[in-house]
From Swiss-Prot:
Binds 23S rRNA and is also seen to make contacts with the A and possibly P site tRNAs. GO terms for molecular function: rRNA binding; structural constituent of ribosome; tRNA binding. It comes from Prochlorococcus marinus (strain MIT 9215). It comes from the Bacteria. One of its GO terms (biological process) is translation. Belongs to the universal ribosomal protein uL16 family. Transmembrane segments: none annotated. Part of the 50S ribosomal subunit. Residues 138-160 are annotated as: Disordered. This is Large ribosomal subunit protein uL16. Gene3D superfamilies: Ribosomal protein L10e/L16.
Length: 160
């Protein structure tokens, strides 16, 4: 399972999850991705379970990129202990996820959109946050250029 090799401090505050993801919110490696819709903590076990589900489904077809890393320790006290006597020991690691964050990416020549969608759906069940499937649109640049050309033409027509 994923966890940092070493950290500066053993224990962290829980913190607050406000706003949307400003980093890691675009597809960088593959053609298809799983994007978070709400905020939450994703544990190292959940990441590993999702990864296994996707890998089993695509077999050896493509490649999977994990875009989140559990770098926040969550501490817990032993059961039936009295209040006080300090903060508990780190029990597991979580990745803080905000809306818009890309969790997993998938790509490769053998991967079709249907296969990627089904693999991501299997991974989705293992995660505590609501997610959606997104893909890179290959004709993304062409329509935007046409719109600017059309808008320039319409502006010229209006001037005349």
């Amino acid at each position: 399972m994923l966890s940092p090799k070493r950290t500066k401090f053993r224990k962290q505050h829980r913190g607050r999850m406000r706003g949307v993801a400003s980093k890691g919110n675009t597809i960088a490696f593959g053609q298809f991705a799983l994007q978070a819709q709400d905020c939450g903590w994703v544990t190292a076990r959940q990441i590993e379970a999702s990864r296994r589900a996707m890998t089993r489904y695509i077999k050896r077809g493509g490649q999977i990129w994990i875009r989140i890393f559990p770098d926040k320790p969550v501490t817990m006290r032993p059961a039936e202990t009295r209040m006080g006597s300090g903060k508990g020991n780190p029990e597991f690691w979580v990745a803080v996820v905000k809306p818009g964050r890309i969790l997993f990416e998938m790509g490769g020549e053998d991967i079709t959109e249907e296969v990627a969608k089904e693999a991501m759906r299997l991974a989705q069940y293992k995660l505590p946050v609501k997610t959606k499937f997104i893909s890179i649109d290959k004709n993304l640049e062409a329509p935007s250029q046409e719109k600017t050309k059309n808008s320039k033409k319409s502006q010229e027509e209006v001037k005349q």
